[in-house]
């Protein structure tokens, strides 16, 4: 069993998605050490305002994905932000986006965002758009409210570990993404709010997307 666990640990450490997280260390090099409430944050940053914990976060979508599937990239911009807010124990409030590129790319990006935002019942309230003939780019940013913010840094030995993931769906052939919209559909709006409910009730104390 110990050998199996050791092999699993090494496989996880070698995964490209995990190795890419090491680049986050650059933020600490530039901005210095800070607690997770003040930022740089965890999956999001917690901003205290008049006694309310607001959670903000952002995601830049892989440029190759934006160019290859702009509609899917728009959907991903919504999903990734809501997943980050959920991991912070936040109820999603709103999204904004920044999009650049030719109209033929920008339009399906926005259509994908509109569809996904409707599916999750979270409004896209604004952003920035620049029409250009250059390479397209897409980033989006989420705002949420947390009764009891969560952080990966609150994890400790002896806690019960639960993997909260959707198993309904199929892996894409072209990019390492696992959409479940067709299979899960209308239940996703509730799914993305489960951790906020758990955090508010006090039975979730740490999380990581």
Language-model regions, residue ranges each:
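Helix-biased detector of long, well-ordered alpha-helical tracts
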Residues: 1-209
């Amino acid at each position: 069993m110990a050998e199996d666990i050791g092999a699993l640990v090494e496989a996880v450490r070698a995964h490209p998605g995990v190795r890419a997280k090491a680049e986050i260390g650059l933020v600490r090099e530039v901005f210095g050490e800070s607690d997770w409430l003040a930022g740089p944050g965890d999956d999001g940053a917690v901003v205290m305002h008049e006694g309310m914990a607001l959670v903000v976060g952002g995601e830049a979508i892989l440029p190759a994905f934006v160019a290859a599937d702009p509609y899917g990239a728009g959907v991903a911009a919504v999903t990734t932000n809501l997943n980050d807010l959920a991991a912070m124990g936040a109820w999603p409030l709103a999204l904004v986006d920044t999009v650049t590129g030719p109209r033929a790319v920008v339009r399906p990006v926005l259509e994908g965002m509109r569809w996904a935002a409707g599916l999750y019942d979270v409004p896209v309230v604004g952003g920035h758009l620049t029409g250009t003939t250059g390479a397209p780019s897409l980033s989006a940013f989420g705002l949420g409210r947390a009764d009891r913010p969560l952080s990966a840094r609150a994890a400790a030995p002896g806690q019960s570990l639960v993997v909260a993931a959707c198993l309904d769906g199929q892996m894409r052939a072209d990019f390492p993404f696992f959409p479940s919209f067709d299979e899960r559909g209308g239940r996703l709006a509730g799914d993305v709010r489960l951790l906020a409910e758990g955090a508010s009730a006090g039975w979730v104390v740490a999380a990581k997307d």
